[in-house]
């Protein structure tokens, strides 16, 4: 008699808090989709710490800005913005040339840039609309024009 080991697929750490169980299986708890304002164990709001003074000595003190943990939606929208900026950067010189020297942007470049922006807008709307991690996993974050 022989045994064939079958390893369970580990849940994607981008979307889940993953722990390995003693039997080799994994437990994946979905990460938060929405941003969360943090509170201490007593339910009091937490604030971003800044360098300040206490009794005339340097110390970390609370600012007026609430401490917020970014959810997956905010993180993914930031990725879309980054990918879009990197894609548009390749043709930004056309825009600069237009502003600085009044040289028209070629139609195909303008069309491409508009398509990239439209893709980003639609993708951000799709991310905003998701209600589960499973829905979020289906969204392509690469610029696809």
Residue ranges and their predicted role:
Residues 1-145:
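A preference for well-ordered globular domain cores
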């Amino acid at each position: 008699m022989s045994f064939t080991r079958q390893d369970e697929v580990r849940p994607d750490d981008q979307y889940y808090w993953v722990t390995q169980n003693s039997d080799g299986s994994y437990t994946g708890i979905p990460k938060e989709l929405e941003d969360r304002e943090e509170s201490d164990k007593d339910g009091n709001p937490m604030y971003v710490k800044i360098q300040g003074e206490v009794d005339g000595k340097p110390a970390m003190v609370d600012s007026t800005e609430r401490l917020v943990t970014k959810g997956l939606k905010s993180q993914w929208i930031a990725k879309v913005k980054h990918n879009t900026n990197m894609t548009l950067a390749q043709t930004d010189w056309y825009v600069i040339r237009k502003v600085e020297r009044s040289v028209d942007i070629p139609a195909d470049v303008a069309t491409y840039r508009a398509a990239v922006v439209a893709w980003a807008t639609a993708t951000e709307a799709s991310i905003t609309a998701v209600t589960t991690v499973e829905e979020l996993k289906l969204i392509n974050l690469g610029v696809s024009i």
